[in-house]
Amino acid sequence: MDLFNYSRRETSEVNIGAVPLGGPNPIRIQSMTNTPTQDTEACVAQAKRIVDAGGEYVRLTTQGVKEAENLMNINIGLRSTGYMVPLVADVHFSPKVADVAAQYAEKVRINPGNYVDPGRTFKQLEYTDEEYAAELQKIRDRFVPFLNICKENHTAVRIGVNHGSLSDRIMSRYGDTPEGMVESCMEFLRICVDEKFTDVVISIKASNTVVMVKTVRLLVSVMEQEGMSFPLHLGVTEAGDGEDGRIKSALGIGALLADGLGDTIRVSLSEEPEAEIPVARKLVDYITSRRNHPYIPGMEAPDFNYLSPVRRKTRPVRNIGGDHLPVVLADRMDGRMETHPQFTPDYIYAGRALPEQTEPGVQYILDADVWKGEPDTWPAFNYAQLELMETCAAELKFLFTPYMALTREVVACLKQHPEAVVVSQSNHPNRVGEHRALAHQLTVEGLQNPVIFFQHYAEDTAEDLQVKAGADMGALIFDGLCDGIYLFNQGKLSHAVIDATAFGILQAGRIRTSKTEYISCPGCGRTLFNLQSTIARVKEATSHLKGLKIGIMGCIVNGPGEMADADYGYVGAGRGKISLYKQKECIEKNIPEEEAVEKLIELIKANGDYEEKTSSLSSPKEKEDK
């Protein structure tokens, strides 16, 4: 793979009904219904809305044989009205259900974490090598007959690993690690190869974007070592709704798409399924528009590890670089100096003149030729102002430069000025590649100047900015290159929206936390309560608890597993019943839905993590996720 130049990974083609995946085909878009699968009319109506929005596959939960058999009626209902969309059965816990679903769906998703292995209980299990091999044989004995049914019915298979539902067997041997998630997938892929079953798609998902990106990168590497080229389904599970869901999905999925990985995507939002499709389409179109871009002659830093990157070593300059949290720069060139009370930038670029009224706690950046050393202000230079930079005594300087202007003279100047922070600019169609090239070149030259990434847009909707900026920053964050972010938008968006997007990107990348984080699933036919209204009520009660992670899950498939990554969890336990978690420990079961939010607040209070709401938002409490 080329870090600096975009091209899609070559994969094998998989036939899924009349809509093939992988190979020369475009990146496919899909979603999943959240209606009960036995309700034929509701499923057909929702599937049509997904297709009308641009969805190319529709997935339905099939928790039992009756649901699997009803896929036939749903198929008939769609085909009879001209909708030929392939249906995907989503199966957990029951190989028998997968066998039945393979006769009616164009593709069946199985979860290695609960296909043969019992559901996750977080118990540490001890196996000898012989006992472990016997467990693998159990999988083969049950999986091969399923593959034979799929061959007979021309049904494709997705092997879908979820971070939240790894088996106790895998966890006991590999721990809660990317290596364990990859091996969980590879156990099944090796059987597919042995049985010459090639209509296979794979996915490895997590709500933690860092884990998701690292694991998919590792999976591709392991597959290449074993001569496999199966196509990838990408997604961030439990991404949430609104701004959070869009940014988190764009960051995780976009980072992988930018490296040419991914043949189909699902943006999992806790909203109506058809709302996912336009977001996914924008993301795919934005990434693939850079095909055949002008070549970027980048040089990879010798110590860079793509599979397990660490933060680039930089010299701290005041509160930038080193071990400091990444900073947020913002623009106020239009003279409007308002800031979001919860998301106040660390530095504001004011251009030619300092504003009459300044924000407390904010530093200001002025053009170097007008900077006079005023308190809390710092000079900004461009790559043509090196002589002026040489004579400036400021203890913090900002040097704006694109990669192609990183000449020997600029490098020499930076070596003489470790107090200079580089602001990387790019107008290249593949700005991810060009930003990467600049950061790598600094390391190649032995420079430890911090790097802030300047991203220039002209968007009129928050969603467009969230998708594009998230996708552009994802790989840079996960590669450990980001010491700061500077979003500049010339569209109709307010500064508050732009600033909130910048902070949201850093939080989604788990490098700076400034608000409550919600891990919420999109819901499916297993969800027996109104997920969207519940999320709204939980947010209303807890959105001021900055730095806290709260999971809101529709059912137990991933719920308990994802709770290990949350401080508190709200998980569906049956019709109208909720279970509450403190991390992965279930504290109280089967609470009536109408009492559950109040009980959640009581649990948070009992553990000393609750603060009463104040009339105005205070500065964000920030912490770095390790």
Curated annotation (Swiss-Prot):
* EC number(s) given by UniProt: 1.17.7.3
Q: Which GO terms describe its biological process?
A: isopentenyl diphosphate biosynthetic process, methylerythritol 4-phosphate pathway; terpenoid biosynthetic process
Q: Which SUPFAM superfamilies match?
A: Nitrite and sulphite reductase 4Fe-4S domain-like
What InterPro entries does its record include? Dihydropteroate_synth-like_sf, IspG_atypical, IspG_bac-typ, NO2/SO3_Rdtase_4Fe4S_sf
Q: In which pathway does it act?
A: Isoprenoid biosynthesis; isopentenyl diphosphate biosynthesis via DXP pathway; isopentenyl diphosphate from 1-deoxy-D-xylulose 5-phosphate: step 5/6
Cofactor(s) needed, names only, are: [4Fe-4S] cluster
Per UniProt, [4Fe-4S] cluster binds at 521, 524, 555, 562
Query: In the record's cofactor note, how is the cofactor described as bound?
Result: Binds 1 [4Fe-4S] cluster.
Reaction equations catalysed: (2E)-4-hydroxy-3-methylbut-2-enyl diphosphate + oxidized [flavodoxin] + H2O + 2 H(+) = 2-C-methyl-D-erythritol 2,4-cyclic diphosphate + reduced [flavodoxin]
* GO terms of molecular function: 4 iron, 4 sulfur cluster binding; 4-hydroxy-3-methylbut-2-en-1-yl diphosphate synthase activity (ferredoxin); 4-hydroxy-3-methylbut-2-enyl-diphosphate synthase activity (flavodoxin); iron ion binding
Enzyme class, top EC level, equals oxidoreductase
Task: Give the record's keywords alphabetically.
Answer: 4Fe-4S, Iron, Iron-sulfur, Isoprene biosynthesis, Metal-binding, Oxidoreductase
Family classification: Belongs to the IspG family.
- Role played: Converts 2C-methyl-D-erythritol 2,4-cyclodiphosphate (ME-2,4cPP) into 1-hydroxy-2-methyl-2-(E)-butenyl 4-diphosphate.
Q: Write down the NCBIfam families for this protein, in alphabetical order.
A: ispG_gcpE, PRK02048.1
Q: What is this protein called?
A: 4-hydroxy-3-methylbut-2-en-1-yl diphosphate synthase (flavodoxin)
Query: Source species, please?
Result: Bacteroides fragilis (strain YCH46)
